[in-house]
Amino acid sequence: MKNTILAAVAVVLTAAVVYAQKVTVDSDPAAPFGGYKTYAWVAGTAAPNPLNEDRLHASVDARLSARGLGMNTTTPDVYVTTHVTTKERQELIASGFGYGPWLGGGYGTTSVQTYIDGTLVVDFYDAKTKKMVWRGVATATASDKPTKNAEKMNKALDKMFAKFPIGAQATR
């Protein structure tokens, strides 16, 4: 049983963590967002699974391109980095009813449900000052289905970038 749970956790972690439901963003109001035209990825960050890292980068790239930012690995205006973390959470679920026959003891069951909560963080740093200028954070319960996690990731990125202060669609 324990091996089955560990295997399920491993599948969830490698299949695709995280992404969606609760999304928050924060930005530096003094940052010169209007002057940012190019970006580059900071190497060595993102998801623990290379497939997910590729999907995540492609999804962020598409959103940045739609906002008018272009990739420039030599002299970018901003650096982009992502972080993915997971945490196991357990909930105790009790069910039953209070009285048995002749007002005796009740019947009930208790079970433990294990979830994997994931967090996706997207950070932007000004290339000149090296200061963080924008952060988007999404948290959700991961699924054991990679396609569901990809949907959650894209939904979270849509919510994040709806509040991104660069581009024609930006809402500040």
Which residues are covered by each model-predicted region?
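Residues embedded in well-ordered secondary-structure elements
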Residues: 9, 30, 69-71, 111-113
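Secondary-structure boundary/capping motif
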Residues: 36-40, 71, 132, 139
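Positively charged n-region of N-terminal signal peptides that target proteins for export
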Residues: 1-7
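Bacterial N-terminal signal peptides
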Residues: 7-16
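Short helix-to-loop capping/linker segments positioned immediately adjacent to catalytic or ligand/cofactor-binding
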Residues: 66-71, 145
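C-terminal/domain-edge helix-coil "capping" segments
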Residues: 20-32, 112-119, 126-134, 139-172
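Surface-exposed short loop/turn segments
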Residues: 23, 67, 78, 82-131, ...
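A structural "domain/chain start" motif
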Residues: 19-67, 75-84, 88-92, 168-172
